[in-house]
Structures are given as structure tokens and as C-alpha cells.
Amino acid sequence: EGKKKHLLNGKPKRTADLKGLVPSVTFTPDDLELAKGAMSVRRAALDALGSQLSANHYLIRRDYEKVLRHKNRLLKDEAPAALVRAMNETLVTCGAQLSCYRAALFEKLAASMASYYAEITDGHERLDAGFVPSWEEHDPLSFATRTFGRDEAREALADALARRGGEERVRKRALVGPHADRIEFFIDGKNAALFGSQGQQRSVVLAFKLAEATLIQDILRQKPVLLLDDVMSELDAARRRALVAFISGDIQTFITTTNLAYFDDDLLGAARIVELEKPRVTSETPGEERMFHVKHSPIDARSARGAAEERGGRPSTPTEQPSARTEGDA
């Protein structure tokens, strides 16, 4: 009891068995951290994509994280050096494999990102992306397309662990391994996280998401489901057009938005629109559910656009949405 279980057609399945079963790409305002946030955000995004494409990627990452936690405990507890060296042997095995997976995947992703970024900016800016494993100490841009074999990765990782072992013991935490791999984006040669404008950073994230969806389709031969959570308000007109053009290409998409004016009549006409009105509290008791009125039938595209234009094209709040009330509470 209390343990999460997964069933597929009534049969129990491991979490790894479900990876990629329904491939999807999620785009939310929080994803802007991909361009300007911590390096761990980019590593997590790359691993999430890799886990959808390959169960091995998911399993290797899971194994590495277990080994890393164990090693960090040993370092924190000032365990004997022999124990740490023994743990390093296991870390090299799964760590080198994970970095190899990442490098090969990122090479494909970066090429697609560059193409989409050029399209978004009408060719006025160039995007480069660099992946550098933790054992390298060079400029990420110099290794944007470099991949390496498993044996090479194991040797390089083992050498780096031996070289920095003393520093790890002093700082009481692991410093070398896939948890320290670097991913950088460059716009016309400048680091996007440090020097990119907000608009440029948003273009980087949009290019990442479009490339992610394309890569899933190319490798799995299956179109992913797109989940777009209120991102239109975060994009300017040019970036919205690029995203709308992509989702118009026969790909199942779920979108939340407060302004239907972001979409053209053709897209609205083909969509099934569900509108939520202002929530009505049914109880003052803390924890009680709030009820919404929901319309489950399509809304005429012209009516939807007309209502949006009457609001001056500005994002509408739930109370400003056209009435979509059903009989009774949904």
C-alpha cells in the first residue's frame, strides 16, 4: 500500500516501460529557464527527451543518480578513500554511458534548433549550441558537434576523477560526472544566458521545443502530443506565428490561453474549444473543490475572434471570456 503502480491493458508495468508510450512535448512559461536558468535545467530537459526516445537512457540516468547519491554520502561522512575509489568504478561505468547518450542526442537536437532559430529570426541571427562533458575544460562552443565513444568516455572520466579526487574530499561532494556536464547556447557567438535579450532567450526555448518535437517524430516515427500551457502571452507576434505554423501541421495539440486572438480563423475553426468561466466556490470549507462552468462544444471561429477583437485584442480574464455556460455545474 502507498506505492505507485502502473498498469497497461490491466498488466503491471515498470515506469521505464511507459517512457515514450505516448511521446509528448510540454511548453510552459517556466521553460524559459532553459535559456537563462541553471545548467541543471538544461540537463534535465535533455534527459527527459532522451528518456522518451530510449528506455536505456532513462535506466542509465536512474542508476547514475543512485550512485551519485551514495558517493556524496561517502564524501560527506569522510569515508575511507578505498571506498570512494570503489564507488568511482561504478560511477565511471554508468556515468560515461550517460554522457555518451547525451552527446549523441544533443548533436541531433542542436542541428535542428539552429534551423528553427534561423527561421524564427528570418536568418538575422545564428544559434550555436555546445555540450561539454564534465571531464573537459574547454569552451563549449568548440565542442558543439563533438561526440565520443564509450571507451574514450570511460578513460577520460576515470582520469578526471583521479585528478580531482583530493578536491572532492576537501569539498565533500562529487565534482566530476554527468551531473556536471555543461550545455550552453550562443547567439552570434555570445552566451545566450549571460548576454541574450529576453526576446532572444525566448527564441532559444521555442527553437528547443520545436526541435524536440521534430526529433521525436524522426526517431520514433510518431508525432508527439504538444501541451502548450499559456505560452502565447510570453511570445511576441513573430514567435507566435512560428509556433502556430508548426502546430497547424497536423499534430495533436492541447493549448491553454486567455486570448483567442492569438490564433487565426483556420486554426480556430479546426479546434475544439473548451472555455472556463470564473470559478464559483461551492463551499467555504478549506479543501473543498471549486466548480467551473465548461462548454464542451466547438465555438464558431468568427464569433470567437469577434469577441476577442471587441476586447481590443488584449488577454482576457476568465470573467471576460464569452459566455460558455452549460446547464448546471460541470
Regions found by a protein language model. Give the residues of each.
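Walker B catalytic acidic pair
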Residues: D229-V231
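Nucleotide-state sensing region of NTPase/ATPase domains
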Residues: E1-V41, A45-H57, A111-A118, L161-G166
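Long, low-complexity, intrinsically disordered segments
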Residues: R302, G306-A330
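Hydrophobic/aromatic beta-strand patches that form the interior of the parallel beta-sheet core
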Residues: V25, F254, R272-V274
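Charged, alpha-helix-enriched surfaces in structured cytosolic catalytic cores
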Residues: K13, S40-A44, A55, L59-R62, ...
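Long, non-coiled-coil amphipathic alpha-helical linker/lever segments
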Residues: L46, L53-R102
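Short polybasic amphipathic segments
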Residues: G2-N9, I183-D188, I273
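Conserved NTPase motor "head" modules and their coupling/switch loops across ABC/AAA+ ATPases, GTPases
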Residues: A82-V225, E234-A238, A242-D250, F254, ...
